[in-house]
Curated annotation (Swiss-Prot):
Signal peptide start and end residues: none
Subcellular location: Virion
A GO cellular component entry from the record: virus tail, tube
Keyword Cytoplasm among record annotations: no
GO BP term, example: symbiont genome ejection through host cell envelope, short tail mechanism
Composition skew (Polar residues), residue ranges: 174-184
Keywords: Late protein, Viral genome ejection through host cell envelope, Viral penetration into host cytoplasm, Viral short tail ejection system, Viral tail protein, Viral tail tube protein, Virion, Virus entry into host cell
Protein name: Proximal tail tube connector protein
Family, as annotated: Belongs to the phi29likevirus proximal tail tube connector protein family.
Region of interest: Disordered: 104-240
Organism of origin: Bacillus phage B103
Amino acid sequence: MASYTMKLSTYIEMWSQYETGLSMAEKIEKGRPKLFDFQYPIFDESYRKVFETHFIRNFYMREIGFETEGLFKFNLETWLIINMPYFNKLFESELIKYDPLENTRLNTTGNKKNDTERNDNRDTTGSMKADGKSNTKTSDKTNATGSSKEDGKTTGSVTDDNFNRKIDSDQPDSRLNLTTNDGQGTLEYASAIEENNTNNKRNTTGTNNVTSSAESESTGSGTSDTVTTDNANTTTNDKLNSQINNVEDYIESKIGKSGTQSYASLVQDYRAALLRIEKRIFDEMQELFMLVY
């Protein structure tokens, strides 16, 4: 029970006093945002909740050093704004100092030079012979067939008209009035008359059919043989002189864990370094609380 002011736990539990069955951690989480309802600098935003929870647990049963909780919160905010930039640098230096999962970091810089000279002399002799033979045979056969057909038809008509009159004239007893054959005059007398009148008409029809055909065949063949022989001899000489200058600059880095220390041990050492900084902060924040126990 507080003797002079109020305990920090009283302020924290005030925000969950009507809720039953809560654990201590749940009560602290309910009251934490109410206590730290202001902004202050922190090296890593994800570490803010961890830091605030550790602060409450460290001073949970301590009496605040001011008459009211409002005055306490004002001085708490002021202290964090003024002092946390310094402690943030300490936190950051621990992060920069090393990776918690590494205990070895080795950088090696080197220079290597390699000169190589090479002389090659190569003689190459070769020969080549090629024989070739070819046989060509040709055969040609040509068949030609042709035919022609001519059909003709002739039609004609012939008409003959003949008129003959023979007249013997003595002293006529009486006059006649006969028309001449050409119709241009008349005959007045005749002792005897003989007439022939002939009409002939002929129709002629002729048909001419001519068919002709022709067929020819020709056959030819030929054979040719060719024999070729090629001989070739080659001689080559290759000379190669080479000089290689190789300069190598290298940087070798080895980073990781070596030795028998486990990763769990490395992480534990890293957390211990952060807790040591927190302990320094909480030691200096004693001035915000009553120095009675």
